[in-house]
Amino acid sequence: MAPPTPSPRPGPPPTPQAAMTTPLKTPASKHRLHFPAMTPRNGGGGGAAAGGTEHPVEVIGRIRNLAAGAGGASALEIAGGGTAVRVRGDAGGCRDFTLDGVSVSEEEDLEGFYRRFVRSRIEGVRVGAKCTVMVYGPTGSGKSHTMFGCAKQPGIVYRALRDILEGGGGGGGGVSGGGGEGDGRGEDDAGFGMGLFVQVAVLEIYNEEIYDLLVGSGANAKGNAPKARLEVMGKKAKNATYISGNEAGKISREVAKVEKRRIVKSTLCNERSSRSHCMIILDVPSVGGRLMLVDMAGSENIEAAGQTGFEAKMQTAKINQGNTALKRVVESIANGDSHVPFRDSKLTMLLQDSFEDDKSKILMILCASPDPKELHKTVSTLEYGAKAKCIIRAAHAATPRDKMSSEESSTMLNSRIVAMNQFIYNLQKENKLREKERNEAQSVLRKKEEELAQLRAKLKLIEGQGAAAKEEEINSKVMEKTQSLRTELMKMEEKMLRQQQELLALQQRLKEVEREKPVQQDIIGGRLLARLSEMSARADQSMSMDMSIDFDMGDQPAAQDVKVIKEDTRKQGQIWSQANTAGSCTSAVEQEDDVVRLSGYPEKVVLSTVFEEGDEEEDKDSGVEEEVCKEVVEESYVMQQPLAEPEDPATRNNRIQNIFRLCGNHRELAKKVQSPAKKAFGDENNEPAKQTFGDENKQQPAKRVFGDENKDPSAWGAIEPPMCDVRVTDSPVSSQLSPIVCQVVDDAKLPVSEQLKSCNALEAADENKENNASGQDGLLEVYIKWESGHLIKGLKLLSNSCLSDLRKLLEDHFEEAGSKQQQQFTFLLLGDPSGAPVSREKEAGVPISKLPSCNNQPNSYLACLRAVKKQPATEQMPFSPLESKLNSALNDVHLAALSPKVNPMSPNYIRELRA
């Protein structure tokens, strides 16, 4: 069978049988160039025409094996020595299609197919040629399998990458056969057996839009990363991403990874049908070579594919649009049209350089199926390939290599050497640049290591300094604490030294006081004797003095005093007489534990008589009932007059008469007051007292009961000015006055003997005499009252007494009164402008004379008490042992100095003195 190319000579007339079959020749075109058929050469890679034209498109057929489920015989046969495909129709006719080569997958695998038809094109790319390998055919014909292969058989893409980067072996024959001059010249034409540096881009054309599959396919990219949409500018995709490198394995893995991102869908025609065109662009910048691998989507019928839905129909329509645009471009070029519609599709726009560039070659692989059901698709594909094979390009006549002169050969070789030298220079330059970068990186790394070493040394230094600073800080704190403790120790030593000096001074003072004690006792005894004698001398003038005092008091009413006197029937013989006991009833002295407590007489109030209670415990033991005698005694007031010349008798009588007129019948009113019932000491008697009056100028004698009179008088010591325990009762006259009580202050622990508390009613005159002479023997009268109340007590103290002595007497009085809760109090200095009370610590340093004067009387003072509310105890630092001892020593010495020791006095001794 003749080749499908037209012949210049007319052929024989057709026979009737030939007229019934499919035409064997491609229809001629009016623009088609007619040239004689030429015999292909061995080792050719698409032979050139004998004249001045060449075929830029080489068409190879790839027939897949028959599907396992398909029935019937194959509809395709290989004819013409493996360069033609015969298609048998259903009616028994056949049609032959002449191609540049045919390969059957049952007889030849992908590796054999690649070595036989593709490797020669790849070797041309390695030396700077440009080649486009596109796979065309209906869906399910094996296009993607031929281009990408499978795990066991790599496709054209991966084999081409390996050959370009790693350098393939010698050439396998061209389309016309193997062997010949081309064998053994492949490596010589390449110049080296070394790998090259390439750049690879992977594009996808889906629904007439170009997408970059390499975008979002990095190691850190997610699987559902969006694809980047690109635009065509200058026959190329703008801003496309490239994979650069010279390692075939690495680039192959990247391409395999992004190839899986293509849009694939299952149809009735193909279980895994590609719904987009895939284009892999591989550039070799060092030699200017370029390889484009195009896996086209298969054209299909919408109804036959079973596509439903708008999106599926749109996909099929866009696929068919691209394939149809490529057919029109091929027909236009083959027909020699002046206008080629490259811009009808994005696919044809990217393939424009492949059709127009004189140095570019196109290898079109037609994939077909031998299934009789796909016969119409197979015929359409073969017609498309036959049409593309008719494309010719007017080019300069190629000079045969065997006819080239030595000069031309040397020129070509020199140009190749220059190119290789330039490439080597670029590689060396790049190597130097990388070496420089490596040196810089090493220097930076070295600097970083030095900085790291410095930082480590600095860190160690800082840690050492920190430890040293911390230790120094600790030492400084220890030194400061030690210094402060030393300073405090020195202060304590100084304080101890001062306290020792004070202690020595106090001990010296104590010795002086002990030496002065006998002298003081002698002085006190002398004063007592003098007063007793004076009281005895004035006993006769007591009655007249009472009247004078009543008149001198003016409008001040007389207070009535009622005292309960218990008489012991067993000791009637031991009652003192009035004359012998008048002085002893006015004073009492007790000594308990070598401590002497002093009491005095008030100047303003003169008690006419005092009655003492007997020892109740002895009475209870004896079982004898006591007889109670009550007597109302009128109390007189004495107004102390300054020492002056006696007044004229006439003037005195006139003044007494005026006073009597002003005072009225207060004495008659006083007689009607009832005597109160017996009460404990300190209780107020609000009821009128029952009183018994005799002669106004006489005092009824009362019975006195004393203790044991047989005691040895030697047991009695010096007697200080005594104080009488009295009870002041209210009356219509005396209720206008503040009650004043003079009491002998007893020790709380050791009560006073009943011998010193007994007296009789006839001693009132002597007491009046003593009251008139108060203040003459160095005694001070102190009247006690609460801050917002009446007078509650009157005391006599030594002139050198202080507030602490007065506090002790008052506390003993409160304790003797039997109060369940002893109320705390403080002293007020009414003359102090601030009104602040005297603190208890300062009472020992405040003398009695600092108290305010009472009614402007000399040696008469008023002590005002303020109740102290109990406050929660506050935490106080305890005294050191030395301070505690010092305070105790100070208090003992002070008490000893103020209260010299005296021996108890016997009543017999007092009788002897009075006699």
From Swiss-Prot:
Keywords (A to Z) from UniProt: ATP-binding, Coiled coil, Microtubule, Motor protein, Nucleotide-binding
Chain residues that bind ATP: G137, P138, T139, G140, S141, G142, K143, S144
Disulfide bonds: none
Any Pfam family matching the protein: Kinesin
Any single GO CC term annotated in Swiss-Prot or TrEMBL for this entry: phragmoplast
Residue stretches of biased makeup (Pro residues): 1-16
GO molecular function, one term: microtubule binding
Keyword Disulfide bond applies: no
Coiled-coil annotated spans: 426-517
Disordered, as annotated region: 1-28, 34-53, 676-718
Keyword ATP-binding on entry: yes
PANTHER family, A to Z: KINESIN-LIKE PROTEIN KIN-10A, KINESIN-RELATED
Family note: Belongs to the TRAFAC class myosin-kinesin ATPase superfamily. Kinesin family. KIN-10 subfamily.
The protein's name in its UniProt record: Kinesin-like protein KIN-10A
Organism: Oryza sativa subsp. japonica
Gene: KIN10A
